[in-house]
A protein has these predicted regions:
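Extracytoplasmic/secreted envelope proteins and their assembly/folding machinery
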Residues: 94, 110, 114, 127-128, ...
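Alpha-helical transmembrane segments of multi-pass membrane proteins, especially transporters
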Residues: 115-120, 222-223
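Aromatic-anchored segments of alpha-helical transmembrane domains
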Residues: 51-55, 124, 200-208
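Transmembrane alpha-helix/helix-exit interface in multi-pass inner-membrane proteins
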Residues: 122-142
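Membrane-embedded catalytic cores of phosphoryl/pyrophosphoryl-handling enzymes
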Residues: 145-259, 264, 268-269
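N-terminal targeting leaders of membrane proteins
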Residues: 1, 8-104, 112-116, 132-134, ...
Length: 271
């Protein structure tokens, strides 16, 4: 019992030290580097893309959307292998690893991993949790298979939800998120790398249309969501870095502990 109390005291000591060392001033807004500060102008491009993509959900634009997809559908892309299932991750992978090839990045590997994880979480939250689960929009391939042939009684949003979650394009969101991260990390000194990443992301969007998985407007909205997710991750990075630095400034000590009947070594770890 005494030994357990001693361990508890050590734990409480560690927690109290943590509370004393954690300083909220370390994540104060004035400490944010200029390149990471929020600016309303940075919302213009992703906002415009999302707004343009959203118009495809309304009747005046919907007719034009169907006409465009009709032309694409005649190319027969619905039977091709969807390699964009894998290519969508190439820009994000480049954002994390391009400096391993000698290209200077704005941040170290740990920061880039944290930036990518945050950006992906935000993008997925917007794209999947918020929109795909709540906006009913039939996929082009399903439209041509069932609706255009008069077989609408065979499918429904409740019974076949994956057939009706076309808006927005998740693949496009992932690809453009990665492309924007490449631009932010490397674009200042290596603009060609940003251009290449955006070219890959654009190719992913085009393939989603060609393969009858998405309408053109789905891709626009997905691109906007991806760019916005990357920029939110970029804005949050200084706060996350300082938060984790505060949490993981570890003090490790090994102390002898005795209760009269024996002695042990106790590890004290302060987060």
């Amino acid at each position: 019992m005494i030994r357990r109390l001693l361990y508890l005291c050590l734990l409480l000591h560690s927690l109290s030290t943590f509370c004393q060392t954690f300083d909220t001033d370390t994540i104060a807004p004035q400490a944010v580097p200029a390149g990471h500060r929020f600016s309303p102008r940075q919302l213009v491009l992703p906002g415009a893309l999302v707004a343009a993509g959203t118009t495809g959900l309304f009747q005046p634009v919907m007719a034009w959307k169907y006409e465009l997809q009709d032309a694409v559908h005649t190319l027969g892309g619905q039977d091709r292998f969807p390699f964009e299932d894998y290519v969508q991750y190439v820009p994000a992978l480049a954002a994390v690893s391009a400096d391993w090839l000698g290209v200077r990045a704005e941040h170290g590997t740990a920061d880039r991993l944290m930036l990518s994880a945050t950006s992906y979480a935000v993008t997925a939250g917007f794209t999947w949790a918020l929109l795909k689960r709540n906006v009913v929009s039939i996929r082009p391939g399903i439209h041509y298979t069932y609706v255009a042939s008069g077989r609408t009684d065979e499918i429904s949003p409740d019974a076949n939800p994956k057939y009706f979650n076309s808006f927005p394009s998740g693949h496009s969101a992932t690809a453009f998120m990665g492309a924007e991260l490449v631009r932010l990390e490397y674009g200042r000194e290596h603009p060609w790398l940003a251009v290449g990443a955006y070219a890959v992301a654009t190719g992913v969007g085009v393939m989603r249309i060609y393969h009858d998985y998405h309408w053109f407007t789905d891709v626009l909205a997905g691109a906007g969501m991806g760019i916005l997710g990357a920029r939110i991750g970029w804005w949050l990075l200084p706060y996350e870095r300082r938060l984790f630095q505060s949490l993981f400034k570890n003090d490790i000590a090994i102390r002898p502990v005795t209760d009269g009947s024996g002695a042990v070594l106790a590890l004290s770890l302060t987060f």
